[in-house]
Each structure stands twice: as structure tokens, then as C-alpha cells.
Amino acid sequence: MSATEELLGNAQHYATDFGKGDLPMPPAKRVAVVACMDARLNPYGLLGLAEGDAHVIRNAGGVVTDDVIRSLLISQRLLGTQEVILIHHTDCGMLTFRDDDVKAQVEADTGVRPSFALEAFPDVTGDLRQSLARLRASPFLSHLDQVRAFAYDVETGQLREVN
């Protein structure tokens, strides 16, 4: 059985006892979390979130990109979130390569060089600070007074705040 088939079976089981169809669209805690997509990082478990509590936006590295700004704009301006939590983590795959090297390999394989930034970074703390700066510089976000950044340690499960 493929992983997808297994997950579809899990989804059927989940639906049999589903009782959350009346959750409102705006998140109850009025918070958005931007986190890395790494499978070792579970924002819901880490932060004690349940369905309906928060918007969780994930990408490679948890990097603040134009698409993250787009999602946060909708989250804040249309759905009422007022706080943002950024989470990067130790031992991140984004620490292991350089954008230009991967772009060159993709171009060699496909004949097309990606036009977008992969956003690899050499330092978790430095990239969290850059992500904070990108958020604070955005004219599109309406709530920037409650933006905090954290580095998650994949070995200990602890969060360390980055200013």
C-alpha cells in the first residue's frame, strides 16, 4: 500500500467521527504561525493548537516570502489574526545547500533554471532576523506589534526566542 492510500484510509476514519463542521473560519486564538515544513516539527503539538485555533503557514525553511506575506495579508485583514509566530529549527535542510548550486543542477537536468529564490540560509538565527525584518517592512500587514520569532531544537523540543 502506498503512503497516499494509507493516508486516505486515515482520512475516512477521521470523517466517521467528525464533529468540527461548525468551526468558524477565523482562528479562535487570532494567531498565525509561519513554520518550516520539516516533518520533525509539529506546530500543533508544539504549541498546543487544535483545529480552529490558528492559521499555520508552512514552507521550506519557514521563510517569509511574497507568498507568506500574501497569506498573512488574508489572515490579518480578512480573518482577524493579530499575532504572528515564526518558527525555524535546528538541523534544517535549508542549511545544507546554496541556491545557485541547486538551480544549476535543476537547469542541467531540465534545461530550465528556476527563476525564484530557493531561500537557503547559512544560519537559523540570522534568517529568523531577516524574516522578522521582511514582515516589519511589509506595507500589507496590519498587525506587526505582536510578531515573535523562535528557533525550535529538533533534539530537545525546546523553543528559543530570537529578537
Range-by-range predicted roles:
Residues 79-89:
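Ordered, amphipathic secondary-structure segments that act as subunit-interaction surfaces
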Residues 37-40, 90-94:
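Gly/Ser/Thr-rich loops at beta-strand to alpha-helix junctions
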Residues 1-27, 62-67, 74, 78-79, ...:
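Divalent-metal-activated hydrolytic enzyme cores
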Residues 34-36, 58, 87-89, 150-153:
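Short beta-strand segments
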Residues 13, 17-70:
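Conserved beta-strand-loop surface patch within small alpha/beta domains used
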